[in-house]
Structures are given as C-alpha cells and as structure tokens.
Amino acid sequence: MKNLTTRQAQILKAIINEYIAYPVPVGSKLLTKKYFKNLSGGTLRNEMAVLEKEGYLKKNHISSGRIPSQLGYQYYVKLLTKNDDKSNLKTRLRAIILQKHKTIDEIIELGVKFINEMVNLPVVLTHFSSDEVLKKIDLIMLDQSCALLLLVSASGNVFKKTISYANQRQFEDIMVCVRIFNDRIIDTRFCDIAQHLDVLKEIIRSKVHEYQYVIDEILFKLFNFEEFQQARKQVYGIHYLAQQPEFANQERLTRILNLLEDTSVWQQMAFMNQNNQTTNITFGDKLGLEGEEVSVASTLINTTNESKHQLAIVGPTRMDYQKVKALLLTLKEEIEEYDKQLHGGKTTSST
C-alpha cells in the first residue's frame, strides 16, 4: 500500500467521510466548497486523478464524481481513523454494564442492542463455549496417501481432519495414535486435552516408527482446539440491511443474508482474530463475496470462564469505521473489566 502525501490523504479522508454520510459520488466542486476552500477545483481534480490511478478511488459511470475503492477504505481504516473521544460512549455503556442482577451474556446482549441503535446496522453475536467433550476418534483410509480422522463429541458434532502419509509405516503410526487416544482421552473436554499431551507424547514415542511425523502431522493438526468450541450465533437488527442502498438489489441482499446465517464464517473469523486485542476490519473479498460492497468490523470479548463472544458489525464498505471501531473497542474493554472484577481480579482469557 503506497503512502500518500498529506494533502492526498486529507482529500481521500474527506471523500470517504462524505460518502459515508451521503452515498453519492463526490466531486471537486463539493470538496472545494465544504472542505478545501484554499484549493482550486483544478488542483483537487488533479489529486483525485492521482488517487484514482493509484487505486484509492474509482469513478462512477453515471457521474463525474469519485467514490472510494476497497483499497481506499483499507488505507482509511489503517492510517486515517483514530479512536474517537470515547468518554461519552464509556459513560453510556457503563450505565448498561452496571445494571444489577445481569449476567455477562445479558449485558453483552444489551450492549449489542445499543450498538444497533448507534449505527443502524446488524450485529452478529457469536458465543464460543469450551465445554465440548471427546467421545470417539475414528480412522478412515481414503487412498494410499491420505486418511480421514473423525473426532466425535458428546453433543454429536463431528470434526474432520485429513492426514497425509507417505508410506505404510506412517499409516501404521496413525492407527497406533488413534488407539492410544481412544484409550487415554475419551470423555475429556477438548479444552483440557492440552494438559494430557506431554503424557501422550511419551506413550506414543515408544510405540511408533516415525515420532517426529506423528508430532508434526497428527498431534499439532488434530488438536486445533479453537475449532472444537461450540458456537452459538444470534443476529440482531437484521432489518437495518434493507435501509442501505448498496443492498437494495434482491440478489445482493440474499447473499448478505446467507453470510449472516453461515456460522462457519464467524467461527473462522474468530479463529483468525484470536490474538487481536483490538477491532479487525474484514472486506467482502475475504468473506467469499468478491465485488460486493460489504465489510465487517469485529472484536472478541474474552471472559474468565474460558468463553469468548465475538461481536461483528456488518454493513456497506462506506460504514463509519471510526464510530464502529470506537463502539466495539469500548464495549470490549468495559465488559472485560467488569468480568474481571466479578471474578476477583482474574485476568480474562486471551487464548
């Protein structure tokens, strides 16, 4: 991403702010009148042409004005937005959080509804629980170089893992590992299996042909614990989508609705963002929606009971990133602090 001059960055920011407020192409005449009284229309047009050439703006075919491109939004999110003055948000959210006799889940739900009202966009709230219990591991040979491991949980969920092997000795090692796992860790919570890995490694070391292969290809790949968390998803404010001009087309709206309903998308997003302590912005091309004017702002709230709560605001790429980032970050900070106080100052989980 190429760095812009100070003036180019200011022009890009003004165009995006204007387009966020009023979703119509922005021209040099408006910029001169509203934002840059000291610059001529010619200068602005030249700078806008440079921004368009570099891919930060694009031209609407029915207007001489420009609109932001996805690259422009990425630059805006990364370099041009700062945390809003959060004092007012903190005050209002704290009033929600300090309501007596409310559980953490209830407080998060109230916070989500507050965000709905503030941005007029839907919010996807996904709860991740670590209570899944392993009941059985099955092995299926697919061909001479690939096997499928099935991990079955007590709730009936089946997690599939494909394991590659180069020869019969490695396949025999896989069978040995499956027998050991079924003997040693059945009826163990997935989140507790890590505590048994050192013992398992010592048992496996004396039983297999290629110990390092087992470690690299089986243990590390098989027990990816984030994937075993139960996910419970709720969507709040879905009706707000119909208010966005970008989603007026029925086919486009249907694709966005399908995105909201796809739990795996939100699980994957949480897994990718698990070490991110702030707000993450994901654009449509990363969500399987190439060419769509959609983006997602998300954050993870960690609580001391090993649960996680992902909040994701879904909207057009022209959403007010400064506002949504401030809302999500403030809610995350306030709830994690409140949860820590409830549990005697224990640090919230960040895994």
Swiss-Prot record:
<keyword id="KW-0346">Stress response</keyword>
<dbReference type="InterPro" id="IPR029016">
    <property type="entry name" value="GAF-like_dom_sf"/>
</dbReference>
<dbReference type="InterPro" id="IPR036390">
    <property type="entry name" value="WH_DNA-bd_sf"/>
</dbReference>
<keyword id="KW-0678">Repressor</keyword>
<dbReference type="GO" id="GO:0003677">
    <property type="term" value="F:DNA binding"/>
</dbReference>
<keyword id="KW-0804">Transcription</keyword>
<dbReference type="InterPro" id="IPR002571">
    <property type="entry name" value="HrcA"/>
</dbReference>
<dbReference type="InterPro" id="IPR036388">
    <property type="entry name" value="WH-like_DNA-bd_sf"/>
</dbReference>
<dbReference type="GO" id="GO:0045892">
    <property type="term" value="P:negative regulation of DNA-templated transcription"/>
</dbReference>
<dbReference type="Pfam" id="PF01628">
    <property type="entry name" value="HrcA"/>
</dbReference>
<comment type="similarity">
    <text>Belongs to the HrcA family.</text>
</comment>
<dbReference type="InterPro" id="IPR021153">
    <property type="entry name" value="HrcA_C"/>
</dbReference>
<comment type="function">
    <text>Negative regulator of class I heat shock genes (grpE-dnaK-dnaJ and groELS operons). Prevents heat-shock induction of these operons.</text>
</comment>
<keyword id="KW-0805">Transcription regulation</keyword>
<protein>
    <recommendedName>
        <fullName>Heat-inducible transcription repressor HrcA</fullName>
    </recommendedName>
</protein>
